Structures are given as structure tokens and as C-alpha cells.
């Protein structure tokens, strides 16, 4: 009887953790999509000049390559979290990739550059939080199933003896 009560309490705890994870994942995905939209709007407003990649200095091209590598790492890390977060991260990476070759960093106002850096940091933080939440729930599920097995074994042992 005690084992059944413990099992019911664990089921309630796992359901609460799953609901929390869904809420965190959906809010992270919607916030990421919103930030990507804001980043695209800011980029289109603050980039009046359309420059070709040939007119960019070498340092700007290498900065572009570094940003592409950063965006690629972020989107590949988000792939394991969930489909919605992967889509939002892809939108954010696409915004950064399509924004960079159009003008040099000199033509961007300082506030726009710092806003872009803050957006990348917040997207990375949300992806890390979602990943941590998913791992926490996964561990909780493992413990729940182990406890369920032990409770069933204890009930069976008590009934058999």
C-alpha cells in the first residue's frame, strides 16, 4: 500500500515536471522567434546601404565567417531540444547570415551591433535552459521508472511471502 502511494506521488511529480518543461520550451521558442523577428526588423532598418561582399574589408569577412560558425553551433545545439526551438534557432541564424554580407560593420550603428550581440547571447541562454530542463526531466523519468519497478517488486515480494 505504501508502495502504491509512493508511486502515485511520483506520477504527480513527473507530470508536474513535464508540464513545466513544456511551458519553458514553448516560451523559449516564442521568445526566440520574437527576437529573431526583431533582429530582422532592426537589420533591415539600420542597413540602408547594400554593399557587395567584394567591397567589405578582409577583417569584416573574417568576422562574418566567425559569426556564421557561431550561428551554426547554436542551431546544431538546438536541434536536440525540440522542433519548435530548432525552427526558432534556424530563423535567428538565417537573420544573422542574411544580414552580414549586406554591409560592413562600420555602417552599422553601435547600438545595433550591441543589440545583435545581446540577441545571440539570449538565444544561447534560452537554448541552454531548455536543454538543461530536458535533461532534468529525462533523469526524473529514469528515477520514476526505477522506483516503479522497485515498488512493483516489493508488492510482488510481499504478496508472495
Curated annotation (Swiss-Prot):
The keyword Signal does not apply. Glycosylated. One of its GO terms (cellular component) is plasma membrane. Its main location: membrane. Interacts with ospA protein from B.burgdorferi. This is Tick receptor for ospA. It comes from Ixodes scapularis (Black-legged tick). It comes from the Eukaryota. Specifically expressed in gut. Localizes predominantly in the intercellular spaces and luminal surface of the gut. In the gut, it localizes along tight junctions. Not expressed in salivary gland or hemolymph. It is found in: Cell membrane. Serves as a receptor for ospA protein of B.burgdorferi, the Lyme disease agent. Required for spirochetal colonization. Essential for pathogen adherence to the vector. Keywords: Cell membrane, Glycoprotein, Membrane. Induction: Increases following spirochete infestation and decreases in response to engorgement, events that are temporally linked to B.burgdorferi entry into and egress from the vector.
